[in-house]
């Protein structure tokens, strides 16, 4: 796992900076605020709350001179996590209901509409077997997103906000 992201207190890469090469649970311990950032290598999930909580957004290599307008965070980035590079196959089993119940479908590619492709109103549990994925609240990879790493997710509503439904899913591939 290698990556590098630089956070800046002010817009347009101005003010004090903090260079991060891995996970950081509390950016506020390094900067008073974060208003812009530059991803020099790797892929990062950023969060609007400390300890990898709250709204999430995927940042790939590039510059974000005013990330609040480009990614839609109303507040500062408070924590970040590096997304490992996955070179093998991708596989996730999605379930219609919590605890791996109801319809089940094995997904190995991006799916822009769970309802249209699998006739499920939403995905409420899943088992990520291979790769790293992003689930989205709305079809076509829009709305709030949530990062999934390999493992079992018995009830997606317990680890996100209770009103959140997931309607599309996409693989995180090397940028």
For each feature predicted by the language model, list its residue ranges.
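Compact beta-sheet-dominated domain cores in extracellular/mature segments
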Residues: 1-175
């Amino acid at each position: 796992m290698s990556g590098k992201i630089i956070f800046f207190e002010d817009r347009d890469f101005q003010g004090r900076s903090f260079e991060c090469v891995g996970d950081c649970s509390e950016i506020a311990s390094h900067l008073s605020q974060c208003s812009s950032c530059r991803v020099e290598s790797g892929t990062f999930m950023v969060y609007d709350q400390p300890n990898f909580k709250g709204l999430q957004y995927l940042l790939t290599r590039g510059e974000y001179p005013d990330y609040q307008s480009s990614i839609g965070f109303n507040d500062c980035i408070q924590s970040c996590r590096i997304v490992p590079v996955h070179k093998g196959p991708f596989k996730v089993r999605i379930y219609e209901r919590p605890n791996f119940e109801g319809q089940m479908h094995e997904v190995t590619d991006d799916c822009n509409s769970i309802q249209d492709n699998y006739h499920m109103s939403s995905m409420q549990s899943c088992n990520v077997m291979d790769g790293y994925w992003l689930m989205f609240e709305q079809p076509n990879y829009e709305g709030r997103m949530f990062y999934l790493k390999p493992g079992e997710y018995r009830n997606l509503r317990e680890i996100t906000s209770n009103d959140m439904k997931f309607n599309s899913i996409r693989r995180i591939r090397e940028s």
